[in-house]
């Protein structure tokens, strides 16, 4: 048998991360049952849907781990706003003591202000966390997209190299075109 001299770069699931690695052996009950019985279209569809669900869940876990790690590495800092000027506090004290209602209303106003300030601080902190999480998720998805694009380009190069070698060995070009049409590669060039 003639040996092929295709240059195959490291095409493995390890380069893409273990997220995309298919099940090996009989670790998946769905695979072992599907392979032991005859392959019916319903079983294949169920197996594909289970595999897609597994991949989606694993991808979501990877994304969440990445976001959590980035939040740990880049803690969110919320600066405290400057306290209000003393003139405002003095004017409020003068109005509050001039009304003659006692010190109860002044402390109620200060408590309400303190609670509002604390609520605003929490809200600003939560908003900053949400923005950071979105930024890190976007960074993760962009990185995954770049990896996928690199893998796709590599596969295109391997296919083009294989086609060139087949043509050099005398394989009919019409058959290659038919194969391209069958596998949906006619739009790639």
Curated annotation (Swiss-Prot):
UniProt GO BP: anterior midgut development; cell differentiation; endoderm development; positive regulation of transcription by RNA polymerase II; posterior midgut development; primary sex determination; sex determination; sex determination, establishment of X:A ratio
GO CC aspect terms: nucleus
Main location: nucleus
Compartment annotation: Nucleus
Swiss-Prot/TrEMBL keywords: Developmental protein, Differentiation, Nucleus, Sexual differentiation, Transcription, Transcription regulation
Basic and acidic residues composition-biased segments: 108-121
Disordered as annotated region, ranges: 93-124
Tissue and organ expression note: Localizes to all the embryonic nuclei until nuclear cycle 9, when expression ceases in the prepole cell nuclei. Associates with the somatic nuclei through cycle 10. By nuclear cycle 12, distributes uniformly in the somatic portion of the embryo and no longer associates with the nuclei. After early cycle 14 (beginning of cellularization) there is very little or no expression in the periphery of the embryo or in either the somatic or germ cells. In the yolk, accumulates at the nuclei from nuclear cycle 8 until 10-11 hours after fertilization.
GO molecular function list: DNA-binding transcription factor activity; DNA-binding transcription factor activity, RNA polymerase II-specific
Keyword Nucleus: yes
Assembly with partners or alone: Homodimer. Interacts with dpn (via bHLH motif). Interacts with da (via bHLH motif). Interacts with Bap60.
Annotated function: Involved in sex determination and dosage compensation. Required for proper expression of Sxl in embryonic somatic cells. Also has an essential function in the yolk nuclei. Involved in endoderm migration and midgut formation.
Protein name in UniProt: Protein sisterless A
